[in-house]
């Protein structure tokens, strides 16, 4: 039972701890926004190209015109919703990523169950493995979605009149389901590990270890961003008097305590700008 719980925990947190996963959430949303920015137009363009090909006599795709047109319009709508809403509300991007995945799976299910040829069935198998790799999400949610989609495929497959005699879709989709879950876990674990490492590096770079204030590097970068964007702001310099005397008289530990106390006072006083307090020198704050 302990092994099962450990396995579930690994799938739930992609090999991270619960605390590390919580820290990764904002970055995960950024990665999904960045991914949807190119995935949706790429899918739309691919479907439009397939629709154009289906209009060519003798292409073998003439009967699929309506299918390609429908899903091209669907991707265009999702792309438009992304541009209008989700780019401004990245905290909800997970909704769009799953809508996109369901759309891709619906396309694959139709190909596998209604067109009834090996090539079309292969499309679904490829989607089952590849689609979860396009987003960043916890492996357990992707695995559950993959299993549900496989169940839907098999249900539709038999409803439309196929039988167990044609086992290409059944056997291959089940194999790809397992492969997709395993590959999804490995890839998502790597993605989350990279995100965690990026956060650690960024925190060490942008945070003063002694006080917890933002660092001089962060100050220079943030000031440059504000200048480039034409943002006006006031800058208050605070210099801690008596630091050298405290170091010489009571030792560096006392001096460090003085610096930390100064930061605490600034942090408590500037409640609305506590994220904009920087330590730019030994005894200098901004």
Model-derived regions, located:
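Amphipathic HAMP/coiled-coil signal-transducing linker helices
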Residues: 196-214, 246
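Non-catalytic regulatory/interaction regions at protein termini and inter-domain linkers
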Residues: 1-23
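Conserved long alpha-helical elements within nucleotide-processing catalytic cores of c-di-GMP signaling
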Residues: 215-234, 241-271, 278-282, 286
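Membrane-helix interface "capping/anchor" motifs
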Residues: 87-91, 133-145
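Juxtamembrane or sensor-core-proximal signal-transducing alpha helices
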Residues: 175-204
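Loop-to-transmembrane alpha-helix initiation sites
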Residues: 165-174
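Hydrophobic transmembrane alpha-helices and their membrane-interface boundaries in multi-pass
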Residues: 42-130, 151
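Central hydrophobic cores of alpha-helical transmembrane segments
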Residues: 142-154
């Amino acid at each position: 039972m302990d092994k099962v719980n450990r396995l579930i925990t690994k799938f739930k947190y992609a090999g991270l701890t619960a605390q590390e996963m919580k820290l990764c959430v904002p970055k995960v949303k950024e990665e999904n926004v960045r991914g949807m920015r190119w995935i949706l137009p790429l899918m739309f363009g691919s479907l439009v190209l397939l629709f154009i090909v289906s209009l060519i006599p003798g292409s073998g795709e003439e009967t699929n015109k309506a299918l390609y047109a429908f899903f091209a319009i669907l991707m265009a709508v999702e792309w438009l919703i992304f541009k209008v809403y989700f780019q401004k509300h990245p905290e909800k991007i997970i909704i769009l990523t799953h809508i996109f995945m369901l759309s891709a799976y619906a396309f694959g299910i139709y190909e596998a169950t209604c067109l009834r040829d090996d090539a079309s069935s292969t499309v679904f198998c490829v989607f089952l493995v590849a689609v979860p790799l396009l987003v960043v999400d916890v492996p357990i949610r992707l695995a559950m979605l993959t299993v549900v989609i496989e169940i839907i495929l098999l249900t539709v497959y038999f409803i439309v009149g196929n039988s167990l005699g044609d086992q290409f879709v059944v056997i291959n989709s089940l194999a790809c389901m397992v492969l997709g879950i395993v590959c999804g876990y490995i890839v998502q674990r790597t993605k989350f590990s990279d995100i965690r490492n990026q956060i650690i590096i960024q925190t060490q770079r942008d945070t003063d270890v002694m006080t917890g204030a933002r660092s001089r590097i962060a100050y220079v970068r943030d000031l440059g961003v504000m200048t480039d964007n034409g943002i006006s702001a006031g800058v208050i310099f605070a210099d801690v008097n008596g630091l050298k005397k405290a170091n010489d008289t009571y030792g560096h530990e006392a001096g460090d305590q003085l610096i930390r106390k100064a930061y605490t006072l600034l942090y408590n006083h500037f409640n609305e700008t506590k994220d904009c307090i920087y330590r730019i020198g030994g005894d200098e704050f901004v």
